[in-house]
């Protein structure tokens, strides 16, 4: 299986960071980051997309799993950016865990 080009995650994350710094009233990301419910709105979206992903898996609907997983990952990126957590921190944590599993 060919390796996926995951640079899209960095590009999307960079756009989210830009929206965090530069408000645009037409931007969905800005609306999430500046919602009156604050972080709770982002948490609601992550929860909603998690449930929709679970349901897609339960229904064994490949296209829907891909679609809902994409929504979930997007909203997780918004959550990370809102909490000043970088993708590098996530990659480092995954690398550390991977190395630990290889040793065990």
From Swiss-Prot:
One of its GO terms (molecular function) is ATP binding. Keywords: Amino-acid biosynthesis, ATP-binding, Cytoplasm, Histidine biosynthesis, Hydrolase, Nucleotide-binding. Its EC number is 3.6.1.31. Gene3D superfamilies: MazG-like. Its main location: cytoplasm. It catalyses: 1-(5-phospho-beta-D-ribosyl)-ATP + H2O = 1-(5-phospho-beta-D-ribosyl)-5'-AMP + diphosphate + H(+). InterPro entries: HisE, PRib-ATP_PPHydrolase-like. Coiled coil: none annotated. It is found in: Cytoplasm. Signal peptide: none annotated. The keyword Hydrolase applies. Pathway: Amino-acid biosynthesis; L-histidine biosynthesis; L-histidine from 5-phospho-alpha-D-ribose 1-diphosphate: step 2/9. One of its GO terms (cellular component) is cytoplasm. One of its GO terms (biological process) is L-histidine biosynthetic process. Pfam families: PRA-PH. Belongs to the PRA-PH family. This is Phosphoribosyl-ATP pyrophosphatase. It comes from Methanosarcina mazei (strain ATCC BAA-159 / DSM 3647 / Goe1 / Go1 / JCM 11833 / OCM 88). The gene is hisE.
């Amino acid at each position: 299986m060919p390796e996926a080009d995951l640079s899209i995650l960095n590009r999307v994350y960079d756009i989210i960071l830009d929206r965090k710094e530069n408000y645009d009233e037409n931007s969905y990301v800005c609306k999430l980051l500046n919602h009156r419910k604050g972080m709770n709105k982002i948490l609601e979206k992550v929860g909603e997309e998690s449930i929709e992903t679970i349901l897609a898996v339960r229904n064994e609907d490949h296209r829907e799993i891909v679609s809902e997983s994409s929504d979930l990952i997007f909203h997780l990126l918004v959550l990370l950016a809102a909490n000043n957590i970088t993708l590098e921190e996530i990659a480092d944590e995954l690398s550390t865990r991977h190395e630990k599993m290889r040793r065990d």
